[in-house]
């Protein structure tokens, strides 16, 4: 499993997209924070929605991930499982390690990549601003764990990588919109999105934060079951 984890981690960092995402995150977060600092009214509204001691810079990174996280993860990892099956490289892995270790190893490799990516952005912004708020980091990683597990689940049930690429763009745009709208909406048809997507649970630091973790575990278990039953 460690081999799968390290390969997935290094492959993610080798991609030009990963470097662009780090630069994009840091640059947009800095611009957003600078804009809010220049507009005291907006800054007060932003900080009133944050916990005491929160950093405007790290908060900006978290907001960007909440909005674009699905799109980012799909862009890099939409074919994390089905590409291995299409190219038949999965056969080399299943001869050496159990299938569940392949799924978990890939999930952890992608998660570690995002942990390092977000940490790099946080370090750069902390050096600029002198502010750091670790609660933002851990909530962002928890959100990304949900997204990674969901993307891996989609890549497990859909055999064609080109289809997951198209679906990834569609879901990467639509799910954040539906999730964020459902948080403040009382309409009955938004309720499934409110409770199945992680946005509602990210509002505070209560026990609700465990629910995205539970969903992540469920997605991974289903992915493992699918892999075990699939003829490779």
Regions found by a protein language model. Give the residues of each.
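Membrane-interfacial helix-loop-helix connectors in multipass membrane proteins
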Residues: 120-139, 143
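Selective transmembrane-helix segments that form parts of the transport pathway or gating/packing helices
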Residues: 17, 98-125
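Aromatic- and glycine-rich beta-strand/loop motifs that create alpha-glucan
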Residues: 1-23, 160, 231-232
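Long, hydrophobic alpha-helical segments
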Residues: 56-83
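Terminal transmembrane helical anchor/hairpin motif
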Residues: 35-56, 164, 169-232
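Aromatic-anchored segments of alpha-helical transmembrane domains
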Residues: 26-33, 114-124, 170-181
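Hydrophobic alpha-helical transmembrane segments of polytopic membrane proteins
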Residues: 72, 136-163, 175, 214-222
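Helix-loop-helix units of permease transmembrane domains in multi-pass membrane transporters
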Residues: 76-109
